[in-house]
Structures are given as structure tokens and as C-alpha cells.
Amino acid sequence: MRIVVLAGGIGGARFLRGLQRAAPDADITVIGNTGDDIHLFGLKVCPDLDTVMYTLGGGINEEQGWGRADETFHLKEELAAYGVGPEWFGLGDRDFATHIVRTQMLGAGYPLSAVTQALCDRWKPGVRLIPMSDDRIETHVAVDMDGERKAVHFQEYWVRLRASVPAVAVVPVGAEQAKPAPGVLEAIAEADVVLFPPSNPVVSVGTILAVPGIREAIAEAGVPVVGLSPIVGDAPVRGMADKVLAAVGVESTAAAVAEHYGSGLLDGWLVDTVDASVVERVEAAGIRCRAVPLMMTDLDATAQMAREALALAEEVRTP
């Protein structure tokens, strides 16, 4: 079975680990979000791609869900001693090595997709990890701050400001002019099923869908497209998805997120058992819906979520 997954960072990576357990023989292609990418200290940092790579490759800091295990921060301390920032973004020494290799390869003319493949040669994540685009795309957030409206990089909004100021718009800068990376459209066309993990629907999955051609390819693939709600009991399972959902005019409910994706894209939608009352509303929108446990408490629970998603895909496939 060929499965395509549109993945952001922590939520997407953890779901993928469960999917590998649930479908060990599947051929999995991950289309990774690059809207979170940022240039720091002269280096190209790809947080979501790296989180997927480290998580599936066994190098992730399990407790925080991002960054490397057994990390040290000597480089960060030395930069701070020179008065060089930003101090709010925590790059560790091991992590720096990844960004140095990536930046060197990009500087030598390799596209991001080829660089990502080279980095994965070390980590062996067990999936094919492709960035959504080789073109530079950065998500910016328009915020009202200090009495004025300004645009900040998504990482500054998320990490430094902790989404504490009102967001009025979320814009994937560069997406309109971007092209899908080599292999992205082909993977979608050859897929047996497409999955949207419980990643952020605006700044993770939504950013991937903003690259011209990707949304259309999924809608036209003619295979089941199943998503899992990142909202449980009217609140994000993790992160601050409610803040960016509000910025695009979507309420923080499992049903509203399904409607945001729409029946033109989604065939099936999983909500948590606490949201069982919305199943009827989602189905009225033309999307098959089931209520199952959606908390990724451990690998077994996550694998069961993946099994439920694949089962719903089969249900949708067989009228």
C-alpha cells in the first residue's frame, strides 16, 4: 500500500511513528511543511522536516518532541556571549550540524529536496521525506502589537511571542509563486490513500496545500483522503492551533476544521470520542466521520489511530 502523509512537526512526526507500527509494509511518502523554515545565524533551519527526520530516525528529544536527544548548547552560549541573537530560538550543538550541512549543500546548488534526501541517508527514517517545495516559502503572521499592525515570521510569533498577541492574518509568503518539489505530485498520483495527521490545519497542512498544484492533485487523485482532528473537546491537543484558526476565521472545533478542509478534499474525518456529537454535522457536510480515541498517549495508542484512519479509508473506498 502506498500512503502519502502531509506532515507538520511534532504531531505529524508522532503520528507517522504510529503509522509505521500500524502498516509496517506500507510505502510511505511524507510531504513535509517548509513554511516554518527560517534563516538563523546564516543557516537554513527546517524545523518540521528535521522533527520528522529525527523522530523517525531515533534522534529526537522525546520529552519536548523537537530538537536532538542528549543535546548541549555551547554554541548558543558562545553566540550569546558575543551578543548575537535571537536568543529565543534554541538551536543545540548537534542540531547546528544538520543546519550547517544543509546550508553548505544549498550553497553548492543542490535543491532542498536533494539535501533532505542526503540528510535522511544518515537517519534512515523508513519513509520518503520530501519538502513540499524546493522554493523558499516562509509563513508570516500579521499581528496587532504595541498599538500597530506588523508582520512577524511564524517562528517569532510561535516561539518568542507564544501566540500571545492577536493574529489577524497568516500568509505563506512565496507559496503562490512556488512549485511542488520533484516527486510530490507523482507520489500523490500513485498513492492508494492520502492522510492528514493531527497537524496544525493552518500553518502545517494548510501551508502545504497552499503550494499551487498540491491541493488539486489530492482532490483529483481519486483515492480516499482521510484526516484526523487536531482539535479535541474544542481545544488543540497541543500547540496553539486555536490562535491561527481564529486568524483565518475558523472556530476551534473538530467539525469546523473538517469543514475548513471541505468535502472537495476530505473523504473521511476522525474525531475524538469526546466529540462524538459532531459526527452528524461532519457527515452532513459530505465527509464520512467516525469518533475514535485520538490522544497520542503512547505508540500503541497512536498506531491504533493510524489503523482507524486506514480502516475509514477502506470504508470510503468501498461504497
Swiss-Prot record:
Pfam families: CofD. The keyword Magnesium applies. Pathway: Cofactor biosynthesis; coenzyme F420 biosynthesis. Its cofactor is Mg(2+). SUPFAM superfamilies: CofD-like (SSF142338). Keywords: Magnesium, Transferase. One of its GO terms (biological process) is F420-0 metabolic process. It catalyses: enolpyruvoyl-2-diphospho-5'-guanosine + 7,8-didemethyl-8-hydroxy-5-deazariboflavin = dehydro coenzyme F420-0 + GMP + H(+). Its EC number is 2.7.8.28. Catalyzes the transfer of the phosphoenolpyruvate moiety from enoylpyruvoyl-2-diphospho-5'-guanosine (EPPG) to 7,8-didemethyl-8-hydroxy-5-deazariboflavin (FO) with the formation of dehydro coenzyme F420-0 and GMP. Belongs to the CofD family. Homodimer. PANTHER family: 2-PHOSPHO-L-LACTATE TRANSFERASE. This is Phosphoenolpyruvate transferase. It comes from Streptomyces avermitilis (strain ATCC 31267 / DSM 46492 / JCM 5070 / NBRC 14893 / NCIMB 12804 / NRRL 8165 / MA-4680). The gene is fbiA.
